[in-house]
Amino acid sequence: MIEQIKANFTESIQTKIAASEILPEHIEKAAYMIVEALIRGNKVLSCGNGGSAGDAQHFASNMLNRYERDRPSLPAIALSTDTSTITSIANDYSYDEIFAKQVRALGQPGDILLAISTSGNSRNVIAAMEAALSRDMTIVALTGKDGGEMAGFLSEHDVEIRVPSNRTARIQEVHLLVIHNLCECIDDSLFPADHGDE
Protein backbone atom coordinates (compact mmCIF):
# COMPACT_ATOMS: atom_id res chain seq x y z
CA MET A 1 0.00 0.00 0.00
CA ILE A 2 2.85 2.42 0.84
CA GLU A 3 4.40 1.85 -2.58
CA GLN A 4 1.08 2.54 -4.31
CA ILE A 5 0.69 5.78 -2.36
CA LYS A 6 4.21 6.85 -3.35
CA ALA A 7 3.48 5.90 -6.96
CA ASN A 8 0.36 8.08 -6.92
CA PHE A 9 2.38 11.04 -5.65
CA THR A 10 4.99 10.45 -8.35
CA GLU A 11 2.38 10.15 -11.09
CA SER A 12 0.65 13.31 -9.89
CA ILE A 13 3.94 15.22 -9.93
CA GLN A 14 4.80 13.92 -13.40
CA THR A 15 1.36 14.88 -14.72
CA LYS A 16 1.74 18.39 -13.32
CA ILE A 17 5.20 18.74 -14.86
CA ALA A 18 3.83 17.65 -18.24
CA ALA A 19 0.92 20.07 -17.86
CA SER A 20 3.30 22.90 -16.95
CA GLU A 21 4.92 22.49 -20.37
CA ILE A 22 1.74 22.78 -22.44
CA LEU A 23 -0.99 24.54 -20.45
CA PRO A 24 0.32 27.96 -19.30
CA GLU A 25 -0.53 29.79 -22.54
CA HIS A 26 -4.03 28.31 -22.54
CA ILE A 27 -4.53 29.27 -18.89
CA GLU A 28 -3.30 32.80 -19.59
CA LYS A 29 -5.66 33.14 -22.56
CA ALA A 30 -8.59 31.90 -20.47
CA ALA A 31 -7.74 34.30 -17.64
CA TYR A 32 -7.58 37.26 -20.04
CA MET A 33 -10.93 36.25 -21.54
CA ILE A 34 -12.52 36.13 -18.09
CA VAL A 35 -10.94 39.43 -17.06
CA GLU A 36 -12.20 41.16 -20.20
CA ALA A 37 -15.69 39.77 -19.60
CA LEU A 38 -15.70 40.98 -16.00
CA ILE A 39 -14.52 44.45 -17.03
CA ARG A 40 -17.44 44.61 -19.49
CA GLY A 41 -19.84 43.81 -16.67
CA ASN A 42 -20.35 40.16 -17.60
CA LYS A 43 -20.15 37.07 -15.39
CA VAL A 44 -18.92 33.49 -15.33
CA LEU A 45 -21.21 30.45 -15.19
CA SER A 46 -19.51 27.18 -14.24
CA CYS A 47 -20.65 23.57 -14.45
CA GLY A 48 -19.50 19.97 -14.12
CA ASN A 49 -20.48 16.62 -12.60
CA GLY A 50 -19.17 14.92 -9.46
CA GLY A 51 -15.66 16.11 -8.72
CA SER A 52 -15.96 18.55 -11.61
CA ALA A 53 -19.08 20.00 -9.96
CA GLY A 54 -16.94 20.54 -6.88
CA ASP A 55 -14.36 22.30 -9.06
CA ALA A 56 -17.06 24.49 -10.62
CA GLN A 57 -18.25 25.48 -7.14
CA HIS A 58 -14.68 26.01 -5.93
CA PHE A 59 -14.03 28.46 -8.78
CA ALA A 60 -17.29 30.34 -8.17
CA SER A 61 -16.64 30.61 -4.43
CA ASN A 62 -13.14 31.96 -5.05
CA MET A 63 -14.63 34.57 -7.37
CA LEU A 64 -17.53 35.59 -5.16
CA ASN A 65 -15.60 35.58 -1.89
CA ARG A 66 -11.84 35.76 -2.39
CA TYR A 67 -8.86 33.71 -3.48
CA GLU A 68 -5.80 34.64 -1.41
CA ARG A 69 -6.31 38.31 -0.66
CA ASP A 70 -9.18 40.66 0.07
CA ARG A 71 -10.74 42.32 -2.95
CA PRO A 72 -14.23 43.14 -4.27
CA SER A 73 -16.50 40.19 -5.07
CA LEU A 74 -16.62 39.03 -8.67
CA PRO A 75 -19.77 37.67 -10.39
CA ALA A 76 -19.75 33.90 -10.84
CA ILE A 77 -22.46 31.27 -10.52
CA ALA A 78 -21.93 27.51 -10.16
CA LEU A 79 -24.82 25.76 -11.90
CA SER A 80 -24.47 22.59 -9.80
CA THR A 81 -25.58 24.04 -6.46
CA ASP A 82 -29.37 24.52 -6.71
CA THR A 83 -30.77 21.05 -5.99
CA SER A 84 -34.41 22.12 -6.44
CA THR A 85 -33.69 23.46 -9.92
CA ILE A 86 -31.46 20.54 -10.91
CA THR A 87 -33.91 17.86 -9.75
CA SER A 88 -36.94 19.56 -11.30
CA ILE A 89 -35.21 19.86 -14.68
CA ALA A 90 -33.95 16.27 -14.48
CA ASN A 91 -37.43 15.04 -13.52
CA ASP A 92 -39.45 17.09 -16.01
CA TYR A 93 -37.03 16.99 -18.94
CA SER A 94 -33.70 15.17 -18.77
CA TYR A 95 -30.50 15.08 -16.75
CA ASP A 96 -28.80 16.24 -19.94
CA GLU A 97 -30.66 19.56 -19.60
CA ILE A 98 -29.79 20.45 -15.98
CA PHE A 99 -27.14 22.99 -16.94
CA ALA A 100 -28.37 24.02 -20.39
CA LYS A 101 -31.70 25.36 -19.15
CA GLN A 102 -29.90 27.43 -16.52
CA VAL A 103 -27.49 28.78 -19.14
CA ARG A 104 -30.40 29.79 -21.38
CA ALA A 105 -32.04 31.57 -18.45
CA LEU A 106 -28.99 33.22 -16.88
CA GLY A 107 -26.47 33.55 -19.68
CA GLN A 108 -26.04 36.83 -21.53
CA PRO A 109 -23.95 37.71 -24.59
CA GLY A 110 -20.37 38.20 -23.47
CA ASP A 111 -20.65 35.93 -20.43
CA ILE A 112 -18.20 33.06 -19.95
CA LEU A 113 -19.10 29.40 -19.48
CA LEU A 114 -16.49 27.43 -17.53
CA ALA A 115 -17.30 23.88 -18.65
CA ILE A 116 -15.50 21.11 -16.76
CA SER A 117 -15.34 17.41 -17.69
CA THR A 118 -12.39 15.07 -17.25
CA SER A 119 -13.48 12.97 -20.25
CA GLY A 120 -14.84 15.81 -22.35
CA ASN A 121 -17.92 13.68 -23.01
CA SER A 122 -20.39 14.68 -20.27
CA ARG A 123 -23.69 15.08 -22.11
CA ASN A 124 -25.10 17.75 -19.79
CA VAL A 125 -21.91 19.81 -20.01
CA ILE A 126 -21.95 19.56 -23.80
CA ALA A 127 -25.61 20.66 -23.78
CA ALA A 128 -24.58 23.63 -21.62
CA MET A 129 -21.92 24.52 -24.20
CA GLU A 130 -24.51 24.39 -26.98
CA ALA A 131 -26.78 26.67 -24.94
CA ALA A 132 -23.87 29.04 -24.26
CA LEU A 133 -23.11 29.31 -27.96
CA SER A 134 -26.76 30.11 -28.66
CA ARG A 135 -26.47 32.97 -26.13
CA ASP A 136 -23.27 34.34 -27.73
CA MET A 137 -21.18 33.36 -24.72
CA THR A 138 -17.52 32.37 -24.74
CA ILE A 139 -16.41 28.96 -23.45
CA VAL A 140 -13.46 27.95 -21.31
CA ALA A 141 -13.35 24.14 -21.31
CA LEU A 142 -11.35 22.13 -18.77
CA THR A 143 -10.91 18.61 -20.14
CA GLY A 144 -8.53 15.66 -20.14
CA LYS A 145 -7.76 12.52 -22.13
CA ASP A 146 -8.40 13.34 -25.84
CA GLY A 147 -10.73 16.26 -25.14
CA GLY A 148 -13.80 14.20 -26.03
CA GLU A 149 -16.78 15.66 -27.83
CA MET A 150 -16.36 18.99 -26.05
CA ALA A 151 -13.27 19.79 -28.10
CA GLY A 152 -15.38 19.75 -31.27
CA PHE A 153 -17.70 22.49 -30.01
CA LEU A 154 -14.98 25.06 -29.48
CA SER A 155 -14.13 27.87 -31.89
CA GLU A 156 -11.09 30.12 -32.12
CA HIS A 157 -12.87 32.47 -29.70
CA ASP A 158 -12.98 29.77 -27.01
CA VAL A 159 -10.17 28.02 -25.15
CA GLU A 160 -9.64 24.41 -24.11
CA ILE A 161 -7.35 23.55 -21.20
CA ARG A 162 -6.73 19.83 -21.73
CA VAL A 163 -4.78 17.93 -19.09
CA PRO A 164 -2.30 15.44 -20.62
CA SER A 165 -3.50 12.36 -18.73
CA ASN A 166 -5.95 9.50 -19.10
CA ARG A 167 -6.51 9.01 -15.36
CA THR A 168 -9.50 10.84 -13.92
CA ALA A 169 -7.85 11.44 -10.54
CA ARG A 170 -4.75 13.01 -12.10
CA ILE A 171 -6.89 15.17 -14.41
CA GLN A 172 -8.94 16.43 -11.46
CA GLU A 173 -5.79 17.26 -9.52
CA VAL A 174 -4.50 19.40 -12.38
CA HIS A 175 -7.93 20.97 -12.91
CA LEU A 176 -7.76 22.27 -9.34
CA LEU A 177 -4.31 23.73 -10.02
CA VAL A 178 -5.63 25.31 -13.23
CA ILE A 179 -8.51 26.89 -11.30
CA HIS A 180 -6.13 28.29 -8.71
CA ASN A 181 -3.97 29.72 -11.50
CA LEU A 182 -7.01 31.29 -13.15
CA CYS A 183 -8.06 32.90 -9.87
CA GLU A 184 -4.57 34.25 -9.24
CA CYS A 185 -4.25 35.64 -12.77
CA ILE A 186 -7.70 37.25 -12.55
CA ASP A 187 -6.89 38.85 -9.20
CA ASP A 188 -3.48 40.07 -10.37
CA SER A 189 -5.00 41.58 -13.52
CA LEU A 190 -7.96 43.31 -11.88
CA PHE A 191 -6.38 44.18 -8.54
CA PRO A 192 -2.61 44.56 -8.93
CA ALA A 193 -0.75 44.40 -5.65
CA ASP A 194 2.83 44.41 -4.48
CA HIS A 195 3.31 40.76 -3.54
CA GLY A 196 6.36 41.73 -1.52
CA ASP A 197 4.08 43.45 0.99
CA GLU A 198 1.88 40.40 1.54
UniProtKB/Swiss-Prot annotation:
| Record GO cellular component, one term | cytoplasm
Q: In which pathway does it act?
A: Carbohydrate biosynthesis; D-glycero-D-manno-heptose 7-phosphate biosynthesis; D-glycero-alpha-D-manno-heptose 7-phosphate and D-glycero-beta-D-manno-heptose 7-phosphate from sedoheptulose 7-phosphate: step 1/1
Which reaction is catalysed here?
Answer: 2 D-sedoheptulose 7-phosphate = D-glycero-alpha-D-manno-heptose 7-phosphate + D-glycero-beta-D-manno-heptose 7-phosphate
Which residues hold Zn(2+)? 58, 62, 172, 180
Q: What is its main location?
A: cytoplasm
Q: Output the superkingdom of the source species.
A: Bacteria
The alphabetical list of record keywords is:
Carbohydrate metabolism, Cytoplasm, Isomerase, Metal-binding, Zinc
Please, what other remarks does the record include? Answer: The reaction produces a racemic mixture of D-glycero-alpha-D-manno-heptose 7-phosphate and D-glycero-beta-D-manno-heptose 7-phosphate.
Q: What is this protein called?
A: Phosphoheptose isomerase
What is this organism's lineage?
Bacteria, Pseudomonadati, Pseudomonadota, Gammaproteobacteria, Alteromonadales
Gene that specifies this protein = gmhA
